[in-house]
Amino acid sequence: MDIRAIVISLLISTCVQADRICVGYLSTNSTEKVDTLLESDVPVTSSIDLVETNHTGTYCSLDGISPVHLGDCSFEGWIVGNPACTSNFGIREWSYLIEDPSAPHGLCYPGELDNNGELRHLFSGIRSFSRTELIAPSSWGEVNDGATSACRDNTGTSSFYRNLIWFVKKDNRYPVISRTYNNTTGRDVLVMWGIHHPISTDETKLLYVNSDPYTLVTTSSWSKKYKLETGVRPGYNGQRSWMKIYWVLMHPGESITFESNGGLLAPRYGYIIEEYGKGRIFQSPIRIARCNTRCQTSVGGINTNKTFQNIERNALGNCPKYIKSGQLKLATGLRNVPATSNRGLFGAIAGFIEGGWPGLINGWYGFQHQNEQGVGIAADKESTQKAIDQITTKINNIIDKMNGNYDSIRGEFSQVEQRINMLADRIDDAVTDVWSYNAKLLVLLENDKTLDMHDANVRNLHEQVRKTLKANAIDEGNGCFELLHKCNDSCMETIRNGTYNHSEYAEESKLKRQEIEGIKLESEDNVYKALSIYSCIASSIVLVGLILAFIMWTCNSGNCRFNVCI
């Protein structure tokens, strides 16, 4: 700042103790920071983290419905009826299933469950079923029920899968047997059957008499004939032959017919699907606790109102969308600019250009004033409430945008058959990557908009005051206005609430402006005179110095001689 400006400011501040009003915004001691598209770690007065990272660490009831733990049985052992799993046969309803990945009781006889992954996926969407007898064992005719030491019940007695019947010869005969099941339940029914593949032709004859038996399974839409494939396979539980178990979901009114002369594992019990829903089969060793949750994962329950979570992708229930980011902070306040230590001349109040105000209560934007009654500060609640409403809408819009788009993708897969739905699980990683990026980009954009909105709100408030005061004040350019008339606290309130009467103070303001302009002109004239005198004196001193320096130089070099005569 040049000497003239300093002198003018000193004269004005000394001669005129003007009333002033400033527009500003809140600043706090908050350490919150957010990222925008162009900046990182921007200080803000407040923010919220949209990503949930906490969970219960336990299995909980989901919306009041308890889960079911399969105990020592795997899903396969439970669904086909391993005799060691009889304690689970009464299960009817669950919110989700829990399977111990190392459960000892699976398929007790060597073999496999066909399309096991698809059946698991089907049961991920079932909430309740009932177990029902499909075909009575006694109706099949001249065959015996088979049992094996590989499948022992809880008493140690040889047995077999409780939902199937293994037919073997009776009185050295195995005639062609045939039965049909008609689904008259009005609901979908899960029907299972199987084929036993002996280790040799001799074993085939021993069990079924016929050397080349067959099994024919027929529905209204397909038919398949099974031949026994003899051979030694890797075994366990003392058995080397093989059993393959099949299943079909029959819709109301459909029927299925079984015809065989050896090797058939016939259906006995099936499952009536009473309610479909959104379920899951979780596999983890965490315990079941007495708790309730809105969202369950294999590592724990999630109870939150946040938009996203990064705990686990395969979550069940009313869950935030999974993203890979561990933190996404959304600005809910304004840019946090600390107040300057020195406020104007002599500690005077200052506007938003010089930083925020730590003393602003119940608002983000407001006014400070200075008059004969002292210094006051007040929030502008109307502009603050509008900003809060905008941010609330912004948060809701983020939730709607993410939910709507994500669910529309999942909806496309739910309209096609189950195998393609299984593919949806496999591409979820790619979908998660896309939505993690989208979520981060959306939050960065919204943070930019929020901070720009706050800046605009402060400028709009400043412009509103400028238009209200008109020529009755001088805009100092820092967010403050120097009033050209006396303005007590009541007058300041009219400026804040927009009821200020400009004409009431116009004459006083006009006189004050003329007085200030006169002081400025006189001050400028005095400054110019002072500068002229200082310039003349300085020039003379420099000239005398040059002359003395020249004389001394000539004397030293012998070119100058002084003669003194008496």
Curated annotation (Swiss-Prot):
The record marks 343-344 as: Cleavage. Keywords: Clathrin- and caveolin-independent endocytosis of virus by host, Clathrin-mediated endocytosis of virus by host, Disulfide bond, Fusion of virus membrane with host endosomal membrane, Fusion of virus membrane with host membrane, Glycoprotein, Hemagglutinin, Host cell membrane, Host membrane, Host-virus interaction, Lipoprotein, Membrane, Palmitate, Signal, Transmembrane, Transmembrane helix, Viral attachment to host cell, Viral envelope protein, Viral penetration into host cytoplasm, Virion, Virus endocytosis by host, Virus entry into host cell. Residues 19-532 are extracellular. Palmitoylated. In natural infection, inactive HA is matured into HA1 and HA2 outside the cell by one or more trypsin-like, arginine-specific endoprotease secreted by the bronchial epithelial cells. One identified protease that may be involved in this process is secreted in lungs by club cells. Residues 1-18 form the signal peptide. GO terms for molecular function: host cell surface receptor binding. The keyword Membrane applies. Disulfide bonds join 22-480, 60-291, 73-85, 108-151, 295-319, 487-491. Residues 554-566 are cytoplasmic. The chain crosses the membrane at residues 533-553. Glycans are attached at residues 29, 54, 182-183, 305, 488, 497, 501. It is found in: Virion membrane; Host apical cell membrane. GO terms for cellular component: host cell plasma membrane; membrane; viral envelope; virion membrane. A lipid is attached at residues 555, 565 (S-palmitoyl cysteine). GO terms for biological process: clathrin-dependent endocytosis of virus by host cell; fusion of virus membrane with host endosome membrane; fusion of virus membrane with host plasma membrane; viral budding from plasma membrane; virion attachment to host cell. It is a single-pass type I membrane protein. Pfam families: Hemagglutinin (PF00509). Its main location: virion. Belongs to the influenza viruses hemagglutinin family. Binds to sialic acid-containing receptors on the cell surface, bringing about the attachment of the virus particle to the cell. This attachment induces virion internalization either through clathrin-dependent endocytosis or through clathrin- and caveolin-independent pathway. Plays a major role in the determination of host range restriction and virulence. Class I viral fusion protein. Responsible for penetration of the virus into the cell cytoplasm by mediating the fusion of the membrane of the endocytosed virus particle with the endosomal membrane. HAMAP family: INFV_HEMA. Homotrimer of disulfide-linked HA1-HA2. Major glycoprotein, comprises over 80% of the envelope proteins present in virus particle. This is Hemagglutinin. The gene is HA.
